[in-house]
Amino acid sequence: MLTDGTEERQFLYAEDCCEALETVMECYSDFKPEDPLHITSFNSTSIAEIASHIQGQFNLIGKDEVKIKPGLAKDSVQMDKRNEADTYITGWWTPKTGIADGIAKVFAEMKKDYE
């Protein structure tokens, strides 16, 4: 890893993002320009947790040699700031795919290229 993995982000599965955008378009007249339409998972996940989920996917296919090696660097992009998303949009849309399921789906799709 490039960093120590402690930085957190609010990851969102691509299909959930598409559904959110579709909902905003379909319900466009419900919103005012100043409404906070934050499209996110509303859950912070550390990079180390993401790496662990990916490692778990490799373990499931017998690739136990895939190990997580955290770096020494700290987050130099967001400087460990936590952005809190406004949940206003959840009156119309909520994400359906958790981080573990999303990673499993992406892993399964990408694995097809190597079979």
Residue ranges of each PLM-predicted region?
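C-terminal substrate-binding subdomain of Rossmann-fold SDR/epimerase-dehydratase oxidoreductases
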Residues: 1-115
